Swiss-Prot record:
Up-regulation conditions: Expressed in the early phase of the viral replicative cycle.
Alphabetical keyword list: DNA-directed RNA polymerase, Early protein, Nucleotidyltransferase, Transcription, Transferase, Virion
Name the record gives this protein: DNA-directed RNA polymerase 18 kDa subunit
Location of this chain's protein in the cell: Virion
Family annotation (InterPro entries): DNA-dir_RNA_pol_18kDa_poxviral (IPR004973)
Catalytic activity: RNA(n) + a ribonucleoside 5'-triphosphate = RNA(n+1) + diphosphate
A GO term, aspect molecular function: DNA-directed RNA polymerase activity
SUBUNIT field: The DNA-dependent RNA polymerase used for intermediate and late genes expression consists of eight subunits 147 kDa, 133 kDa, 35 kDa, 30 kDa, 22 kDa, 19 kDa, 18 kDa and 7 kDa totalling more than 500 kDa in mass. The same holoenzyme, with the addition of the transcription-specificity factor RAP94, is used for early gene expression.
GO biological process: viral transcription
Length: 161
């Protein structure tokens, strides 16, 4: 996992009825709802601070909605291939094996090990080591996938500690 900070203009949509005395509050809510803790293009905004002491570019009227470009200071988080993370092993069937972390889902290919059934629950066997369903495992991220709204998605392999 890596972090970086940048200033950027984030476009948000404001409805005409939101153009009132609470305009800045409505803009803040729109920015937070659209960008905070949402994965887009491999990055997730973990902290957003709206910069209020700079001029804001002119808004655009698009299909009866107002598009405002808001100046923000953003802390972004991202994962890259080769990162090592820990999470909970989740096995729903022989072909659906994943490791769930706080904001990342790592899919494990079934051909990298064997799914078996032990003590009335699924387990994953790799190189003779048994990993029980819902146990904590360590994975190495191998390939980025298209993410879900609030989670990064990667293919990966379980590694031994």
């Amino acid at each position: 996992m890596s972090l970086f900070n940048t200033n950027a203009y984030l476009p948000v949509v404001i409805q005409p009825h939101e153009l009132n005395l609470d305009l800045m509050d409505n803009i803040k809510k729109a920015v937070i709802n659209k960008y905070l803790h949402k994965e887009t293009s491999g990055f997730m905004a973990k902290k957003i601070q709206i910069v209020e002491d700079t001029p804001m570019p002119l808004a655009e009227l698009v299909n009866n909605e107002i598009v405002v470009h808001v100046t923000c200071n953003i802390d972004y988080k991202y994962y890259k291939v080769g990162d090592i993370v820990s999470g909970i092993l989740t096995i729903t069937d022989e072909s659906d094996i994943s490791v769930v972390c706080s904001d990342l889902i790592c899919k494990i290919r079934s051909d990298s090990g064997t799914v078996s059934y032990d003590n009335s629950k699924y387990c994953f066997i790799k190189n003779g080591k048994v990993y029980a369903n819902e146990s904590t495992v360590t994975v190495m991220l191998k390939e980025a996938q298209s993410g879900m709204e609030s989670s990064f998605v990667f293919l990966g392999n379980i590694i031994e500690k």
